[in-house]
Amino acid sequence: MKILLINTVSLGANGISTFIINSAIGLAKNNINVTIAAINRVNRPLKDKLLANKINLKEFQGRNSSPIKYFYALKNYLIRNRFDVVHVNGNSTTMAIELLAAKSAGVKLRIAHSHNTTTEHPFINKLLRPIFEYSVNGRLACNDAAGRWLFKRKKFDV
């Protein structure tokens, strides 16, 4: 099984990153092929930690500044690498970018993982809601409030 864990914020010293890294370490220890996708250039100590734990790293640029270019780069990467699962970690329906890329690339399981109860981009969040709903087929939340906020009345797991 090949799993791609995507961070929609910078991979570094923050809560979402800690969750992703700890999850990746656990998966790798169980001999699962796991890759973390970062939207920033990751510092050397963190790269070394991932490598030491047999975790692959793919750095992407432009999620916020060039989202269409980012979408196609991610989609092409997904097609080339044939992941079974894409697990996107974020705070809003802007995860639709990654989920639609995964759906377009033929990834069977596309998980959105909600880590918050608000967004800094309410208009974009509302605009992307239909694409998000179309593309997601697995729903996780770090707590009940985060799940209710992002997934509304849809079923999700904490």
What are these model-derived regions, one by one?
Residues 1-158:
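Membrane-interface segments of envelope glycosyltransferases acting on lipid-linked substrates or membrane lipids
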